[in-house]
Amino acid sequence: MTTGSALYIPPYKADDQDVVVELNNRFGPEAFTAQATRTGMPVLWVTRSKLVEVLTFLRNLPKPYVMLYDLHGVDERLRTKRQGLPGADFSVFYHLLSIERNSDVMIKVALSEGDLSLPTVTGIWPNANWYEREVWDMFGIDFAGHPHLSRIMMPPTWEGHPLRKDFPARATEFDPFSLNLAKQQLEEEAARFRPEDWGMKRSGANEDYMFLNLGPNHPSAHGAFRIILQLDGEEIVDCVPDIGYHHRGAEKMAERQSWHSFIPYTDRIDYLGGVMNNLPYVLSVEKLAGIKVPEKVDVIRIMMAEFFRITSHLLFLGTYIQDVGAMTPVFFTFTDRQRAYTVIEAITGFRLHPAWYRIGGVAHDLPRGWEKLVKDFVEWLPKRLDEYTKAALQNSILKGRTIGVAAYNTKEALEWGVTGAGLRSTGCDFDLRKARPYSGYENFEFEVPLAANGDAYDRCMVRVEEMRQSIKIIDQCLRNMPEGPYKADHPLTTPPPKERTLQHIETLITHFLQVSWGPVMPANESFQMIEATKGINSYYLTSDGGTMSYRTRIRTPSFAHLQQIPSVIRGSMVADLIAYLGSIDFVMADVDR
């Protein structure tokens, strides 16, 4: 096993090194091949025969890696810069997170094209279920022992595995789409739910169960989302969430866009998050490039990200209250969002999807008069939140519908990969802005809102308090905005600062290449997670030394949150499910990508 700086590139924490020592002591250094990356965590390759044993060891350490944060694959066949790594046609990575250590570790396993099979780890982490299904769906990698290995993003009738490098990436490479009656009937039959396929019975000892399709076009499903309910009267015996209706192939598209031109696509993952989506992507690209942005860029990025946290939470608040029966507040929250969008549009030029962050900075400097717009909003919103709390959130009907409903504890949340307000509502004090500050969050004073019961009501109240904390952060940005440039003076800043392009022919050529072909990033891997509007969102980028990403893995919080639904809602009423869905705060683009 390689050691020292070859293990991973700083920044890293002491606990990261501790786990490498523990693994070496248990399995011997020869069991691992370390990979040097810019992910900020140990990245270790193991053999397939050792995989389950290593993962089980990490899960059961005294300070365990309790969360399977992510699991996915890479088609390695066209990757040229793989020196020092095990030979592989495909690889699968397991990204583990320990709350107690505040530490991550990534375990990788190499596979040959003729033997694409791994043992399932659903017995170690229950949330591996959907991740393994997606890896099979996208790459065709089998997981032996999986309880139901089937399509999850693509339709049941789909042929091929889209994230393989030999699968077409453009619509023009496919035959024109047509839908005749026979094909329509085939698709409808393929979508039919058969309880036996999922281990469900159609009847019990004294009753017949009813199976109800909620969605994919139901107002309380919050998007194109289908959940099949097994009902005994109004009681939910079991359920099966069915996702993928909003899948657009964002990770595949990243392989055909330059590092710069993919930025607008990030806006459309959590399409309510705006520039919050840009942030983990540009931070990860900047790690690859070795760019350190000016202090002013960090403060601007934080200010605008917190504005979008507020707009997202306001929409959540209005629709959540509407889901449990109050029709009026949603109109007020949307009006309040408009006040925020007035500020956002004045600064970025756009409202919902500004695509405003850039590699090495932001698109342009703050406009004249921005201070007054921000100041007016900061002074105005807290009083509105007080009104919502008093008029709606203290309402006895709303509290009766949500207190004690769809509750789970911290242990269950971590097992299912829950992050964000859903995790903090259980009392777990884990907010990346405090635990692992990025973009200068360590320079701001704010509290991390917590609750204790982990129910639908607590999840709502945590988000309301998060809006108050966002106002505190924005106010500090307003009062302490640094002077200086809005872009880094670095060769890979894209687009480059305009003043540098008009001096001589060399800078003009550099500018032309970067805005046409795109910047060339060094071959390596990088990773960045942030505390986004709906939980932890991250980008894991692989560069092969080109103008486009070799592999872009987008880990979203909502995917994990929807997988948890059956474990939480069994034994509850259908009405409780509606309150639960509203309290999760998800959009299907964030789930399906």
Swiss-Prot record:
Alphabetical UniProt keywords: Cell inner membrane, Cell membrane, Membrane, Multifunctional enzyme, NAD, Quinone, Translocase, Transport, Ubiquinone
UniProt enzyme class: translocase
Lineage top rank: taxon: Bacteria
Region span, NADH dehydrogenase I subunit D: 208-593
Transmembrane spans: none
Protein location: Cell inner membrane
Membrane topology: Peripheral membrane protein
UniProt-annotated stretches for the region NADH dehydrogenase I subunit C: 1-184
Enzyme Commission number(s) of this protein: 7.1.1.-
Swiss-Prot/TrEMBL catalytic activity: a quinone + NADH + 5 H(+)(in) = a quinol + NAD(+) + 4 H(+)(out)
Disulfide bonds, paired cysteine numbers: none
GO CC list: NADH dehydrogenase complex; plasma membrane
GO function terms (MF aspect): NAD binding; NADH dehydrogenase (ubiquinone) activity; NADH:ubiquinone reductase (non-electrogenic) activity; quinone binding
PROSITE patterns for this protein: COMPLEX1_49K
InterPro entries: NADH_DH_suC (IPR010218), NADH_DH_suCD (IPR023062), NADH_Q_OxRdtase_suD (IPR001135), NADH_quin_OxRdtase_su_C/D-like (IPR037232), NADH_UbQ_OxRdtase_30kDa_su (IPR001268), NADH_UbQ_OxRdtase_49kDa_CS (IPR014029), NDH1_su_D/H (IPR022885), NiFe-Hase_large (IPR029014)
Predominant place of localization: membrane
Function: NDH-1 shuttles electrons from NADH, via FMN and iron-sulfur (Fe-S) centers, to quinones in the respiratory chain. The immediate electron acceptor for the enzyme in this species is believed to be ubiquinone. Couples the redox reaction to proton translocation (for every two electrons transferred, four hydrogen ions are translocated across the cytoplasmic membrane), and thus conserves the redox energy in a proton gradient.
NCBIfam families, A to Z: NuoC_fam, NuoD, PRK06075.1, PRK11742.1
Complex and partners: NDH-1 is composed of 13 different subunits. Subunits NuoB, CD, E, F, and G constitute the peripheral sector of the complex.
Family as reported in the entry's similarity comment: In the N-terminal section; belongs to the complex I 30 kDa subunit family.
HAMAP family: NDH1_NuoC, NDH1_NuoCD_1, NDH1_NuoD
Name of the featured protein: NADH-quinone oxidoreductase subunit C/D
Organism: Pseudomonas fluorescens (strain ATCC BAA-477 / NRRL B-23932 / Pf-5)
